[in-house]
Design a protein with these regions (language model features):
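Serine-hydrolase catalytic core recognition
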Residues: 72, 112-201
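Conserved beta-strand positions that form and line the central face of beta-propeller blades
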Residues: 53-55, 92, 105, 149, ...
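A short loop-to-beta-strand structural motif that recurs across blades of beta-propeller domains
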Residues: 41-43, 92-94, 136-138
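Short loop/turn segments that connect beta-strands within beta-propeller blades
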Residues: 46-50, 97-101, 142-143
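Short coil/turn segments at the loop-to-beta-strand junctions that recur within blades
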Residues: 9-13, 58-63, 109-113, 153-157
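Conserved beta-strand position repeated once per blade in WD40 beta-propeller domains
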Residues: 17-21, 64-67, 114
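Short, small-residue-biased leader/transition segments that mark boundaries at the very start
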Residues: 4-8
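Beta-strand C-termini and the immediately following turn/loop, strongest in propeller blades
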Residues: 1, 19-37, 46, 55-56, ...
């Protein structure tokens, strides 16, 4: 019987989030998600729990690992807050070498991206939308090249009935520095000269 042993230990002075480890080469290497430096990033360990290198770094947030291409030694992951002048809540798919080189955005565009990849990490099904756009689904290769549109929602009936998209907005917090993001839903018969009650949720 194989004995259990601790491979990786992580600690913080605050509440600690965790994500599943990704095994590479049947456990000869491990990819860990950690918030140890105040941002969520990926770290590469050997099978004994020795840190080999950081994979990602910077003032942005890795959310989760999507796929590891072991043959090319590339990890695909979802992250947010990296793209300047975009809503930091919007997730994108990125790829980077396990040695931390070659970081590349796979799903461009100021949208929230939900993705799935095939077992060989060759193709990406990219579902993307915002509250003020019509959702679409594209098939892409793993470098981010669009191959075809798979589906686009039909909003014609809603628009004909008077539907209007909500309006995203950005304001400064009380500190005058921090950006706050929100969405405004107006009545479909909105009159800019009238007064309306506001529900802050």
């Amino acid at each position: 019987r194989r004995q259990r042993q601790m491979c990786i230990r992580d600690s913080m002075n605050t509440y600690q989030e965790v994500r599943p480890l990704a095994a590479v080469g049947d456990g000869k290497e491990l990819i860990q998600w950690s918030e140890r430096d105040g941002w969520a990033h990926l770290y590469l360990y050997d099978g004994e729990g020795n840190l080999k290198n950081r994979i990602t770094r910077g003032p942005w947030h890795v959310d989760q690992i999507v796929k590891v291409d072991e043959a090319k030694r590339v990890v695909y992951f979802l992250a947010n807050g990296k793209e300047k002048d975009e809503n930091p809540y919007y997730e994108h798919l990125y790829r980077v070498g396990l040695d931390g080189s070659g970081l590349q955005q796979v799903t461009p565009g100021d949208y929230f991206h939900t993705v799935s990849m095939d077992d060989n990490a060759a193709f990406v099904v990219n579902n993307y939308s915002r509250v003020n756009t019509i959702p679409r689904t594209d098939l892409m290769d793993s470098n981010g090249r669009k191959l075809m549109t798979l589906e686009e929602s039909d909003f014609s009936g809603l628009l004909a009935a008077g539907y209007q998209f909500p309006e995203p907005f950005k304001v400064k917090a009380a500190d005058g520095v921090t950006d706050l993001y929100g969405v405004m839903y107006k009545p479909f018969n909105f009159d800019s000269t009238a007064l309306y009650p506001i529900i802050d949720y």
